[in-house]
């Protein structure tokens, strides 16, 4: 198309970038946790991934660049912290599938860690976002683990989440108010409420 004044508009074809897949849920949770901290409601933090730095290009302190690093030990879960005197520990996962959540998305050591937290009186759960469906679920670790221990397939169908998990609706601030579900659980309610 020719615009007045000879202005040419570039046709920008957006490339699909897979390196940050799963980051939208993480960003929403990070913003939510910042909000909780600002209003002094809870103190929940993203755990750093444990790495061993092997090689550094060190021209100056301000310009140091890590050239080579390795994961030292398997990371446990994404987030942990305190809320109303309770220890909270959880994992956040995204999937583009419309029908199921692949068990390959979560590692055995993470499941064991969540189970240990639950057995020791903490609150452990997994937040799973089905990005294509724009649905985010809060599933208690014990329900997730029970399914995994009895699984005959390598994925969890979405109908399991619809029956056993709590739906987390998107809100402006905080983006994902998962502590509403934690309040419901702490309150001693065993039933599912959406």
Regions found by a protein language model. Name each.
Residues 139-162:
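Short, electropositive alpha-helical surface patch
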Residues 93-120:
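Mg2+/Mn2+-dependent nuclease catalytic core
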Residues 2-12, 16, 162-194:
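Charged phosphate-binding loop/patch that engages nucleotide di/tri-phosphates or the phosphate backbone
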Residues 8-67:
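Acidic-basic catalytic patches of nuclease active cores, encompassing PD-(D/E)XK
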Residues 53-54, 97-100, 134:
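Short, solvent-exposed loop/turn segments at secondary-structure junctions
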């Amino acid at each position: 198309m020719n615009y007045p004044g000879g202005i040419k508009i570039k046709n920008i074809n957006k490339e699909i970038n897979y390196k940050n897949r799963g980051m939208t849920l993480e960003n929403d949770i990070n913003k939510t946790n910042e909000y909780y901290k600002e209003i002094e409601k809870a103190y929940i933090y993203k755990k750093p991934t444990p790495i061993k730095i092997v090689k550094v290009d060190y021209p100056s302190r301000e310009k140091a660049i890590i050239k080579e690093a390795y994961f030292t030990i398997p990371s446990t879960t994404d987030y942990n912290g305190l809320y109303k005197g309770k220890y909270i520990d959880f994992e956040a996962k995204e999937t583009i599938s419309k029908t199921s959540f692949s068990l390959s998305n979560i590692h055995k050591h993470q499941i064991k860690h969540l189970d240990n937290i639950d057995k020791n009186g903490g609150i452990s759960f997994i937040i799973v976002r089905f990005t294509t469906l724009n649905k985010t679920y809060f599933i208690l670790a014990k329900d997730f683990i029970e399914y995994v221990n009895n699984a005959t397939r390598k994925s969890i169908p979405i109908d399991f989440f619809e029956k056993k998990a709590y739906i987390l609706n998107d809100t402006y601030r905080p983006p994902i108010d998962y502590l509403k579900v934690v309040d419901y659980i702490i309150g001693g309610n065993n039933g599912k409420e959406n």
